[in-house]
Design a protein with these regions (language model features):
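Conserved phosphate-binding/catalytic region of the ribokinase-like
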Residues: 37-43, 68-169
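Ribokinase/PfkB-type carbohydrate-kinase core domain
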Residues: 1-49, 55-104
Length: 169
C-alpha cells in the first residue's frame, strides 16, 4: 500500500509508531484525528494529509471554525505544525482545503440528509481511495464529498457506504 489511513481510536503510541514506519518507507499517512485529542508536532510531521472536522480543527489550531475565514486560519495554523495538506470537513458546507500553499473551498453536493452516521468515515475512505489511484487532492476531496453525500441519504453506517460506481462527480 502507498497510503495508510489512520484514526485515533487505538492507542496513540501505536498510531505514532505506525506513522513513523510508514514515512520511513515513503508511504503517505492520512490522519483522521478522531476522536479529537492533542497531538505532538513530531507526530504530525509524519502526516501527509490530515482530515479534521470543525471540532478537531479547533483542537489542533486553537481557532473555532465557523466560516471560510476561520477555516482558512485554522488550516494555516495546522499546516504550520508541519502538515503539507489539511482538509477540514465542514459537513453540508463541504471541505476547506490547504494543499501546500494553496487554499480552496470545495462545496458539498446538496442532498436531503437522512442520517449522518458514518459520513465522516465514508469521506475519509473515499478520499484515500481516490488519492491512492493517483488523483489530485482536489479531485479526491470532490470524490469524498460525493461519496459522503450519498451516505447521508441512507440510514445506518455500513449499510450507507456507497459502491464506487455510485459516486458521480
Amino acid at each position: 500500500a502507498d497510503i495508510i489511513l489512520m484514526q485515533l481510536e487505538i492507542p496513540i503510541d501505536t498510531v505514532e509508531y505506525a506513522a513513523t514506519i510508514a514515512c520511513k518507507y515513503g508511504k503517505k499517512v492520512i490522519l483522521n484525528p478522531a476522536p479529537a485529542s492533542s497531538l505532538s508536532n513530531s507526530f504530525l510531521m509524519n502526516v501527509h494529509t490530515i482530515l479534521p472536522n470543525r471540532i478537531e480543527a479547533e483542537m489542533l489550531s486553537g481557532i473555532k471554525v465557523m466560516n471560510i475565514e476561520s477555516a482558512h486560519r485554522a488550516a494555516q495554523a495546522i499546516g504550520e505544525k508541519g502538515i503539507e495538506n489539511v482538509v477540514i470537513t465542514l459537513g453540508k458546507d463541504g471541505a476547506y482545503v490547504k494543499e501546500k500553499d494553496e487554499y480552496t473551498m470545495i462545496p458539498a453536493k446538496e442532498v436531503e440528509t437522512i442520517d449522518t452516521t458514518g459520513a465522516g468515515d465514508v469521506f475519509c475512505g473515499a478520499f484515500s481511495v481516490c488519492l491512492s489511484e493517483g488523483h489530485s487532492l482536489a479531485k479526491s476531496v470532490k470524490f469524498a464529498n460525493a461519496a459522503a453525500a450519498i451516505a447521508v441519504t441512507r440510514i445506518g453506517a455500513q449499510s450507507a457506504i456507497p459502491y464506487k460506481r455510485e459516486v458521480v462527480l
